[in-house]
């Protein structure tokens, strides 16, 4: 895993390598093991490397034999060994063992059609001097980030926004609608990025830059074509796909570890990883000094069962508050939860243990309907059909005991979930979340709210739904929304890629093997969610490899301390400054008066509810984000060009 950046232009002359060195410096955390540059006619690439496959021979940018095709690449193609054999049988000659070179030859052989053959997580750019084009692409589920902007006849692209801004050519301007999306959906909807004029390349798409224009094309679409399948056959297929997915993701020339929360999904991936590893598996987890959030006992039990060497990062005191500015710097977006902060600490623990690659369980909840949200859909539909049922309160209590008992008002929340949307609304499953999150908007300043007049991000989402969406069951519609609104732009990004790569750690996700997704998406929903029992088929299969208690353990939502983290004794000084009336006024997103009231309630302990927690985190993170990227951005000094592993000019190696 690495970081990439580049510029393609229709203007005469080559790209200044110094500009590329500035862009690369801004993302060097993604690739601490080396860096390189390419400057050709109308194009320039930068690359920072995290060496995992072919450690000695995988420096980038990399060319084909005659230098006409050049690539800068972030990610992993797990089936590169099989693709290499196919390409060699067609006459291609390889100089390295790295998957990067496989992409170069795959592009030569198949062009854009290569993407359907790749099993991996990737974002890359390929310069083709034969037709003066640049080809950019992103993996099916958006595991790896890629941003771009087209300005004044040039296309700029990079793994992170800060690399684009570090070029010196692009000004950071707040996109108000993007922030409104964060405060509705938890994240921006691709292609928005948070900054006006800069877009995220959407998952499952590629772009072709030629003649001063960038054209975006889709090569992969999520689909849920339910088919009947014999339960025994389904279990056997699941067994094969899970083992293949993990085995492929164990391919590396460095040790591979695993994140192990103690839950079902991470226990599965870690167990299979331990079986496939030639060495004792290193596993890692986080816990909290708050006993209500402490799952360390389950984590240790899981590690003992697997036989892994386990390390735990305990998060307490001011740990979240102290790292929060760094978290925002790497996330590059306002947040409404502190959940990425413990993941930042977890990645640091992993790096300090000498591990660069970890397998994790992300994707299982979306594929196998593991979230409470999916059960909530079933409960809400039942309660709307049976308004007089005495089971209604008990069903909600079973779903959200922590929400109903934390001072938020249990009866209020029961009424709220019942009144949030009609079953015929295509967004029925997610409207409660949207409405709870949108509570933040009452703190908008008058000017910011006025700038959003006439914009309804929820209605825009409704209008954007694909035709096939309306053929699916309600639960599959819910899964689609969860994957497109939360998995890629938040869980795999702010909480995933950004926190891991802040410390040069690569996360790999066996549940996001596209073959496993396509299998799970075609299963009847009843085999994934039976009554209120989530992940039914996954649990049945897991009995083969996990202790009975682990395979039966109910889903535990990942929660991190929020408001108390920022008002503990000896809290960092930046908090008071960021939340001061003068700072709030200068940023302009929120009302100083409204925020002052929220801060007083939070500081006094009167505001302990879910919504107040979200609002405080939203305000503080927005203040930090605006300061770091808009008001007072500071970028690292440019990388030393003479120290590069490779410098290519006009596709001819010169050093």
Model regions and ranges:
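Adenosyl-5′-phosphate
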Residues: 1, 113, 166, 175, ...
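Short secondary-structure boundary/capping segments
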Residues: 327-328, 372-379, 634-637
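Short aromatic-enriched loop/helix-cap "lid" or pocket-rim segments at secondary-structure transitions
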Residues: 296-297, 324-325, 370-374, 564-565
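Short catalytic/ligand-binding loop motif for oxyanion handling, primarily in non-cytosolic enzymes
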Residues: 133-135, 144-145, 165, 269, ...
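Cysteine-centered catalytic environments shared across enzyme families
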Residues: 1-332, 343, 543-544, 549, ...
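Acceptor-substrate binding/catalytic loop of class I
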Residues: 334-337
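Short acidic/histidine-rich active-site segments
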Residues: 355-371
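A mobile, often basic/glycine-rich helix-loop segment
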Residues: 366-397
